[in-house]
């Protein structure tokens, strides 16, 4: 069954460079860009006005934001492999690069649901898990030089998954700190991974132009979503877990019904790459190479 979405607001030139990450935090949308800024936008008002602009210490730009499920911790990763942990209420931050034990050349990060641990991928293939309050390393897995492009924490806190340049996916048990599954299905870079809200399913996508759905416990593939004609850089489940949002480098945005594994909506308001997507209460939000933020709502939503 098809579902219609409408563009409800476009914030043109929201940043001065590509927008690489979007996260909903404490009632606001956070956007991060190659211009080294993080901006907060109102979710509540129709104009989605700018709430606050933060000049970050990321001198080469910001490409990843991660938020804990309780929304009390935000981690930002920059192109200089610098990592900062933020208090979203006060905007106070600390530089994890000052920790001599911290892995160098960090690329992406994710945070446990309670905000107590942070996991990182790195350009040299390591996956490191750190205690957030103390900044002490809990565990580290070496994937033998395979660039970790993306990472996610399961909402139940039991698993971490990382996607790599080689197409490999590593599912790690947080209880043991060891590999739980090595997931097959991709032979080209995996650029985005996402757990379902119930932590039962995992979506992975990238240069293969398809989205693979896995059963988390068994590691089995349960679906392949085909329809994109270009590299996919972002996937995200909606809060209920019945829909999956995906976006590619040619500006195509798709919504998938997880029960039927079928595409129910396609949007294409820009030809530029979409680097980031996020859900909010009335629909979803996308941003990318054209420096704009687009807000969509379901056609039946007032």
UniProtKB/Swiss-Prot annotation:
WD repeats by residue range: 14-51, 57-96, 101-140, 142-184, 185-226, 227-266, 269-302
Metal-binding keyword on record: no
Coiled coil, from the record:
none
Pfam families this protein is in?
WD40
GO CC terms, sorted: cytosol; nucleus; Ski complex
Protein's UniProt keywords contain Repeat: yes
PROSITE patterns under this entry?
A: WD_REPEATS_2, WD_REPEATS_REGION
A GO term (biological process) for this protein? nuclear-transcribed mRNA catabolic process, non-stop decay
The record lists the membrane-crossing segments as: none
What are the alphabetically sorted keywords of the record? Answer: Meiosis, Repeat, WD repeat
Q: What does this protein do?
A: Required for formation of the rec12-mediated double-strand breaks (DSBs) that initiate meiotic recombination.
Q: How does it assemble?
A: Component of the DSB catalytic core (DSBC) complex, composed of at least rec12, rec6 and rec14. The complex interacts with mde2.
Q: What is this protein called?
A: Meiotic recombination protein rec14
């Amino acid at each position: 069954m098809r579902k219609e979405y409408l563009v409800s607001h476009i914030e043109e030139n929201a940043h001065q460079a590509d927008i690489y990450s979007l996260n909903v935090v404490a009632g606001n949308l956070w956007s991060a860009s190659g211009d080294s800024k993080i901006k907060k936008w109102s979710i509540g008002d129709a104009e989605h006005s700018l709430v606050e602009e933060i000049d970050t210490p990321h001198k080469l730009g910001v490409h990843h934001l991660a938020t804990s499920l309780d929304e009390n911790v935000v981690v930002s990763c920059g192109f200089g492999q610098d990592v900062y942990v933020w208090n979203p209420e006060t905007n106070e931050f600390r530089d994890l690069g000052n920790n001599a034990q911290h892995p160098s050349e960090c690329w992406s990060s994710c945070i446990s649901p309670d905000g107590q641990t942070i996991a990182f991928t790195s350009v040299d293939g390591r996956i490191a898990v750190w205690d957030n309050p103390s900044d002490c390393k809990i565990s580290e897995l070496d994937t033998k030089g395979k660039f970790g492009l993306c990472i996610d924490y399961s909402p139940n806190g039991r698993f971490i998954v990382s996607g790599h340049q080689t197409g490999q996916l590593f599912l790690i048990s947080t209880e043991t700190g060891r590999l739980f599954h090595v997931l097959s299905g991709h032979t080209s870079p995996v650029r985005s991974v996402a757990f379902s809200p119930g932590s039962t399913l995992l979506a992975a996508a990238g240069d293969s132009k398809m989205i693979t759905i896995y059963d988390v416990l068994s590691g089995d593939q349960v679906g392949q979503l085909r329809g994109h004609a270009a590299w996919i850089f972002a996937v995200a489940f909606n809060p209920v877990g019945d829909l999956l949002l995906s976006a590619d480098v040619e500006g195509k945005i798709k919504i998938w019904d997880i029960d039927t594994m079928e595409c129910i909506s396609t949007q294409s308001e820009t030809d530029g790459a979409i680097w980031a997507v996020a859900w909010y209460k009335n629909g979803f939000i996308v941003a990318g190479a054209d420096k704009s933020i687009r807000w969509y709502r379901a056609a039946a939503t007032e």
